[in-house]
């Protein structure tokens, strides 16, 4: 799992992460907060943002009254998050940490966005779900999202290339990602390239890595094994988007019994 923290995206270019990946954070956090309240996790509850990245979701949820702890394997992303929390410093904290090793029965809810695709082995996936179950209080809420295999194959076969160019204080930055599909292992083979042009000099970083997509049956099995029930599936952080409508699976679940 430490492999992820070596990606230039998460290390030397962590400072540019939010420039390259634009998410509707406030809109999605409004939905997340509504789901939390619906499951009994009210403002004032302690929530873990597992794999928090630059902390934007943690900070927004703290503004909505939650007590948020964000952890990530990348020290560089955590450094960005700690510089960004601004006026909500009393409601949010950040630390380098491993989502497979969590304190027992501490949290009312856990949020895990886009992280679980980076765990490619069965044992690692099992360990993370065991950690989530152990870290949640009884009736605690788990909200996560993953890439769904069949829809991801369809999308990446149609759109294998992603490129974005942004102007930054450090120069012109071009990010390119190319995805190939390994059907046999149900994995995405991804090649990333950062090109930073500063004062006529170009710096290039390249990195290849693997993502393993998910299928709903696998999620159902792991959630049931670790005593999660009351499952709701969506295709986005939007109650109006049905599962299967996008290449994402968003799951809201509740820990219904003692951890396995």
List where the protein language model places each region.
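Class I SAM-dependent methyltransferase SAM/SAH-binding core
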Residues: 55-100
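C-terminal lobe and adjacent flexible extensions of AdoMet/dcAdoMet transferase-like proteins
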Residues: 210-260
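Conserved class I S-adenosyl-L-methionine
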Residues: 1-51
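SAM-dependent methyltransferase
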Residues: 143-218
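A short acidic, Gly/Pro-enriched loop at the edge of an enzyme's catalytic core
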Residues: 102-110
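A short glycine-rich, Lys/Arg-flanked "PGG" loop and its adjoining helix->strand segment in the class I
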Residues: 126-138
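A short beta-strand submotif of the Rossmann-like class I SAM-dependent methyltransferase core
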Residues: 112-115
